[in-house]
Amino acid sequence: MIVGVGIDVVDVARFGVSLSRTPGLTDRLFTPEEAERPLASLAARFAAKEALAKALGAPEGMHWHDAEIRSEESGRPVFEIRGSVLRRANDLGVGSVHVSLSHDAGIASAVVVLES
């Protein structure tokens, strides 16, 4: 059963400007492993975190580091959730978090589906 769905899009260039203009923003949004990725990948990961927040009902007190995107050997993105995000997911009865990322033509996008 579907528990929640979220989608988000990010303008890659504008996101890059925000990261460069705001000291510490990269560290607030991304884990050290995520932060090593190129800009388009960071934008897609931010879109995924925003989409996850929407799917969870925009929980108060959500910490960005509690939703980390890792890649399986195949390259498939997967969320590793913990802390505030895991608590909210458990409250909603989430058993699986599905995520799809894309970036092309200067736009990054992500879709998240929460399943019981």
From Swiss-Prot:
Keywords, alphabetical: Cytoplasm, Fatty acid biosynthesis, Fatty acid metabolism, Lipid biosynthesis, Lipid metabolism, Magnesium, Metal-binding, Transferase
Q: Name the InterPro entries for this protein.
A: 4-PPantetheinyl_Trfase_dom, 4-PPantetheinyl_Trfase_dom_sf, ACPS, Ppantetheine-prot_Trfase_dom
Its protein name is: Holo-[acyl-carrier-protein] synthase
Q: Which residues bind Mg(2+)?
A: 8, 50
Similarity remark: Belongs to the P-Pant transferase superfamily. AcpS family.
Q: Extract the GO molecular function terms from the UniProt entry.
A: holo-[acyl-carrier-protein] synthase activity; magnesium ion binding
Q: Highest taxon of the source?
A: Bacteria
As for subcellular location, the record says:
Cytoplasm
Q: Which Pfam families match?
A: ACPS (PF01648)
- Its EC top class is transferase
- What is an annotated GO biological process for this record, any one? fatty acid biosynthetic process
Q: What's the catalysed reaction?
A: apo-[ACP] + CoA = holo-[ACP] + adenosine 3',5'-bisphosphate + H(+)
Which EC number(s) does UniProt give? 2.7.8.7
An example GO CC term for this entry is: cytoplasm
Described purpose of this protein according to its UniProt entry: Transfers the 4'-phosphopantetheine moiety from coenzyme A to a Ser of acyl-carrier-protein.
Q: What cofactors does this protein use?
A: Mg(2+)
